[in-house]
């Protein structure tokens, strides 16, 4: 059983118990979600399902059946389930020697009702960190909404990554999603903004993307 599934999705007595389905900001993406594949141009170099150290080792994907959905919108079957009901991901590349991972996300990031960060932190990030990963590049152009909850897991992730000389960079997250993160005061745990908001990352090899993002991060940290 995954670690996060053993933890309570705790809500305080004053927390809203129900939130109506959000009106997603990009309607055209709604109807096309089943056609959006995770980036696949690096698959000849890395596949998480064949990586014995990956949380997704041994994962199988149907080419014909849509097994995942965000509300009533089916997702392409190549996306991986991280435990959330609305947020899915793909580990595009992991380099254990250099200590970094490039992770792509799709769906709705809902900490308020789903405590999505708990699943991400406990079941994905922690196993990766146990194998020396401390630098995380999160690609979020297909994250359509963000709903804030508690910041405990963000704080924990930030502290643990920082202690290992690492960081968490957000790449190409939508403006309204970044605004919602800033409003919840969790942007302080990430590197975001500037070049990271408009990077043509698909044109890079993974090590070149890491070098570019790492250079930006170092300039930001040294500013």
Question: Which positions does each model-derived feature cover?
Answer:
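Short polybasic linear motifs
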Residues: 4-11, 17-26
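N-terminal catalytic cores of peptidoglycan-degrading enzymes
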Residues: 29-81
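A cross-taxonomic marker for long C-terminal extensions/tails that follow the last structured domain
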Residues: 34-43, 176-223
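STAS-typified acidic loop motif
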Residues: 74-119
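Short, glycine-/small-residue-enriched flexible loop/hinge segments at domain edges that mediate gating
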Residues: 104-109, 126-150
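Charged helix-capping and loop-helix junction motifs
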Residues: 119-122, 150-157
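Short beta-alpha junction loops
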Residues: 138-144, 169-179
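A short acidic (Asp/Glu
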Residues: 146-154, 179-183
